Design a protein with these regions (language model features):
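Anion-binding alpha/beta catalytic cores of soluble intermediary-metabolism enzymes, centered on
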Residues: 96-162, 202-203
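Short beta-strand elements in bilobed, periplasmic/extracellular small-molecule ligand-binding domains
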Residues: 36, 58-72, 186-193
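Rossmann-fold NAD(P)-binding glycine/threonine-rich loop
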Residues: 107-128, 237-259
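Conserved hydrophobic helix-helix packing surfaces used for dimerization/oligomerization
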Residues: 34-36, 162
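Glycine-rich phosphate/diphosphate-binding loop of Rossmann-like nucleotide-binding domains
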Residues: 41-55, 137-228, 232, 241-244, ...
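Short, well-structured alpha-helical segments in soluble
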Residues: 78-90
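Positively charged, low-complexity intrinsically disordered leader regions
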Residues: 1-31
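Glycine-rich, N-terminal phosphate-binding loop of Rossmann-like dinucleotide-binding domains
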Residues: 99, 216, 236-237
């Protein structure tokens, strides 16, 4: 079977169109406008870019969307007080904290301060537990996006061999928990390989995968001969490997060597 490139932009556009209809219906039938606040601490260029993109999409979908920018030297206590304000705000249904936070702030303490019912990144321990037992309302965005790509571009993963390369709290672990659920769009046979897995075993597992999800954080780590013919490969990695002499822009590559 010839390799087929999944065009994520097309899938994203389709999802945005579906969400816009849902938001319009929510407003018309229930007179409710989804409210989202994104809290940005400092001026990290990558974080600013991410938050700007989130705000743009939120406004396009018709959300009541707030971008709350705070100085990098904000105290932990002040940030916790700000979160509590939005926890109590009935117009806000979702709270996003853009990571990373400055070193003087305990990220876990901040994330755990968010009302679990407004924790749309699903980082709160309550939501992590809900994901594990399959009663979740929210999923972390990257694993959820991977699941959408698989179902829309590859097909039902039920019974398929899924290999997740990486065990981060943001991608790897929740990805495993999502794909093993006995529900539509999951119900797969899942293996997780990571830094504790010998490389020869990593290669062995990858070659067996019907669906390979790579979130290793290592540029061009997975090689073409690690992937069996017809397998679906989702490359989560975004790695900066230098600067282009022609454009002066960063050169970004994934965790899979597609060349």
């Amino acid at each position: 079977m010839a390799a087929k490139l999944i065009k994520g932009a097309e899938v994203a556009a389709q999802i945005r169109e579906e969400l816009k209809k849902e938001v319009d219906e929510l407003k018309a039938k229930h007179h409710v406008t989804p409210g989202l606040v994104t809290i940005l601490v400092g001026e990290n260029p990558a974080s600013v870019s991410y938050v700007t993109a989130k705000q743009k999409t939120s406004h396009e979908l018709g959300f009541h969307s707030i971008q709350d920018n705070q100085a990098a030297d904000i105290t932990e206590a002040a940030l916790l007080a700000l979160i509590e304000k939005y926890n109590k705000d009935p117009k806000i249904h979702g709270i996003l904290i853009q990571l990373p936070l400055p070193k003087h702030i305990d990220s876990n303490k901040v994330l755990y301060a968010i009302d679990p019912n407004k924790d749309v990144d699903a980082f709160h321990p309550v939501n992590v537990g809900r994901i594990l037992i399959g009663t979740y309302a929210f999923l972390p965005c990257t694993p959820a996006g991977c699941q959408e790509l698989i179902n829309r571009a590859y097909g039902d993963p039920k019974g398929k061999e899924v290999v997740v390369l990486g065990r981060s709290n943001i991608v790897g672990k929740p990805m495993v928990a999502i794909m093993i659920q006995k529900r539509l769009g999951a119900n797969a046979t899942v293996t997780c390989v990571h830094t504790g897995t010998p490389k020869d075993k990593i290669i062995e597992h990858c070659r067996r995968a019907d669906i390979l999800i790579v979130a290793a954080g290592v540029p061009r780590y997975v090689q073409g001969d690690w992937v069996k013919e017809g397998a679906c490969v989702i490359d989560v990695g975004v790695n900066r490997v230098g600067v282009s002499e022609k454009t002066g822009k960063a050169i970004l590559v994934g965790d899979v060597d597609f060349d």
